[in-house]
Every structure is written in structure tokens, then in C-alpha cells.
């Protein structure tokens, strides 16, 4: 519960342990206490400290949510035969678009589900378009919004010049997709949107733009539009501490946190499967997800919980109530997440909380002796006279191991630990200073200099596509004329 002491009795000692062991970790924090207390100590331990601060963006390091997509697109262009690189970029683009559309409170769209499904495909398409055809400094999520904004405009098709009676308007989206090869996945992800007309077309575009509004913030662009000083692979190979600070009162920033965690966990699983001998990270990765219950829906999070532990990735979700998971992921999703948790630590319940009843049932029952004493009096005799007759019976009954009242009365620093394969017990987890942990001067983040953001322009994208298409045509003609001539294999598309 709120004020139960998660940070001072659990998070800080565990981060201290992670630093001593040399393991990388990621922590989320709504107040910024963990960064303030442990920033300097991380540097003393030889860690690279990444500060993602959505509460004070001008004091934050940068992290481009398209960084992984851009990376795999570049790797594919350098080696076009590695189709798996392009496939991975497509997968991350789809995951990013899915998380953007399925933000907290999304109920599937109801009767408007067509527009939301189309928006998801369109956002995926534009993400790949920006990653593949924009300049390096323009490849970020805000450029996706700007491209969509330009798509609202229309252009006249060439048919207008020959048939003045039949005015056919071609959208900017249709114009740019028509320049791409027929089998280009950018065209496929867009689906039926390019062929839509009038209000239907505008509805899909505006729906897509509305889901991207969380990224439109002049201060947050300082984070979202620049590449990070570390790569995702650094987190698994080196000693890296990532502190994510977010305002719990601003729901638009919650989706940014969930997107970050989703990308890191997904890439960690792929890295463990493809680049390690035993299919698990050689350096353990801890993810301390404080306030996990208020984060929006994270795509494939149920699969991540099931697959992460065997890859040496330990996810530690901290929630206020299981009802938070039920609200975001449904009853089945809540059950799956709970079943994947091998160790459960709970305590600090509010006096008005019904959650104590749930965890009391989780602990199970114990067998105790219960009895009764009855006294029968003969007529005319006193209660304690020789005529009294008393009987005593003892029965064995089931009693909760800890009743809800007993759970609510647990003092500060006392937590119930229920671990797989062992009996539950009450652990004494005092405040961190009682452990002998001494924290020195607080870590103070410096204010970063504002750097203007470069945005993609649709005309530049069209020009780039035409130039690459022309180079591809020239190359094909040269190959057909001189089949034995060696040709650069760099992909133009």
C-alpha cells in the first residue's frame, strides 16, 4: 500500500545488493528518490548511469524510442541478405505502434474499432518510412506525428490534367506509397487507408495523431528525439544503471515508461536467445518496476513474464493492489502475471483495504484446536453448587494462517514473504539505514542545454525515395548489360 515503505525497506537494499554484485538494473520511481540517493554511488562502483527523467525533462538524458528500429534498418541496408534484420525492425515498429494505440483506458474501440486497427497499421507504416528514408537526426517518433500531419493535405493527381470533368484527388499518403515497390511492407502495413476517401481517410489520420499526442511536448522532445548515450546491448554487457523518473499525476508520461520497459525486455530476450551460448544473459538484469500497476497496457507483457526468468532477467513489479492489474490486463491477464511470480512480498495494508482479504486467502489455513465449555445446573441448586454439571469439548478446525486484521496490523518493516517451495514467513526488513547503509551527498542532475529538434519533411522523404529508385534502376540496367561486373550490394530501399 501507499506509504508502506517499499522504497526505504526494499528498493534501496536491493539496489545496494545489485551494485555490490555488479549486475545491471533498471528502476522506475515517481519521486526521483532512487536517483538522488544512488546516482553518485553508481558512478563510484564504475556504473554507467542513465537518467531518464520525465518529471524534469531538461535534466534528463535522451532515449529515442525508434533507436532499435533505426539500428536494425541500418544493419539491413549494410547487408540486404540479412532479412532477419529488417524483420526485427518491423517487429519493433509493430510493437511500438501497438503500445501507442492501446494506451490506458483503451477498450478496443467498440464500434470504431476499424479506425483504431487502421491507425495501428498506419503508424507502423510511417515508423518504418521515417526509419528508412529520413536523415539520421530526423528519425524519431515526433517526425512520425509531423508526417501524419502533412498527410492531411491532398494533392491533385495527373488525371486532373486530362479529364477536367473527373476530378480525382490523390492523398499525400497515396502519392508516397505509390513510389515504393509493390512488395514493400511499408505499403502493406498501411492496409486500406491509402484507398480511403473523404471523412473515412481523415478519421484514420486524426485517430493516429490523437494516440501520438503523448509524445508532443517541447521539453520531452529533449529526451525522445535524440539517441541515447548507451545502446541496449550495453545494458546486458556492461554495468549500467537506468533510473526512470516519471510524474504519477501525468498519465500521458506513463505510456513512455511502459514503452521503454517493453523494448528493453523484448530486446533482452532476443539478445539472450541469439548471442549467448546458454540462451540466457551472462550478466543478470534486474527490473525494479515500481508503480507497475499504473502503467498502461504493455504489449506481450504476459509472454515476457513467462520467458524472462529463464533468460536471467528478473522482473520485480511493485503494485498497490491486484485490482490495478485486473483493470489493465483483465482477469485472465492478472492471473497469468500472478502465476509467473515465484516470490511474493506483501505488507503495509491500508485499514480500509480489501486487498488484505485476498492475501489472507493466498496464505492458506492452519489447523488449530478449538473447544467449548458448557455447564448444566440442577433445579434449585446454585451455579457452583454440588449439583452443577460441566462438560468440555475440543475440536480441530481450520483457521487462516493470518487473518486480514492481522495483516493490516503488521508494523512498519515487517513483510510477509511467500516463496515457491517453502512455507510463508514474516521477514524483518527495517529501514535501509538500520542495515548500515550510509548514503553520501545526493546526486544532483545538471540542466541540459536545449538543442533544437530536426523534424522530417514529407517533400524530403519523397525526394529521397525517388533518388534511391533512380539509383536502383541504373544499377539494374548496368547489371543486365554487364552481368559479370561486381555491384555494390547496399540496399536502396
What are these regions (language model features)?
Residues 1-313, 328, 339, 405-426, ...:
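P-loop NTPase motor domains
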